[in-house]
């Protein structure tokens, strides 16, 4: 992570949230738009369900990786933000601190499972009542939370028998990789040599990676990008996705040193 092109922290992905996608669908016989039947309109049914989803927050669940993230991140911050990061590590976590951190999408993603509407599809003509309305809901599930719990929660949130919920991308659970000293130590040494003073921070990735397949094969996996990104300028999956050119070249130098270190050829 960087700020104003200056490295602030070096993250190591040791776990990732579980990717899952669901389809919410309501149907009706349709008709002409001059004779509306609001109580039967699939668009209204799905829209109301999405409003309920937008107002719901999944419970907070911290694991080894997310705890380490907030513990180390608190050392980088000052004032209220640093205090809030320490406060959520208490047992029980401070509710006011949770509310403030949850207001920031980046930190909220480290605290809980999230589900969000990403696509809508409804109707076939502007002068006809819709026969169907569909909404795609993408969820990022905490690695230690059973996906079945999330699917059941969606059913309770939707709370409408007229809406069918189907899984369109089946979740593949991905167990966290342990924070082993023999893994972190070489990374920390290389970071200290190249970016003095920049701390290494374990992170639970909110996105998805191929690491889940390796972890499910019993191979502990760690994501080491070495590409510093500004959290206020992340454009992943966008048409204008980009990284700093200098960050790219710095990363290739780091990767070369890292591969030599883990291959036993540090010099």
Predicted regions and their residues:
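Short, solvent-exposed loop/turn segments at the edges of secondary structure
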Residues: 7, 15-21, 110-112, 130-132
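A generic structural motif
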Residues: 30-34, 124, 139-145
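Short, hydrophobic beta-strand segments
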Residues: 24-27, 135-140
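An extended, acidic, His-containing surface patch that forms the Zn2+-binding/catalytic region
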Residues: 62-127, 131-132, 143, 148-152, ...
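A short core secondary-structure module
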Residues: 29, 33-59
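The feature captures the short pre-catalytic strand/loop hairpin that immediately precedes
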Residues: 20-34, 231
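A common structural junction motif
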Residues: 53-57, 155-163
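Short, small-residue-biased leader/transition segments that mark boundaries at the very start
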Residues: 1-3
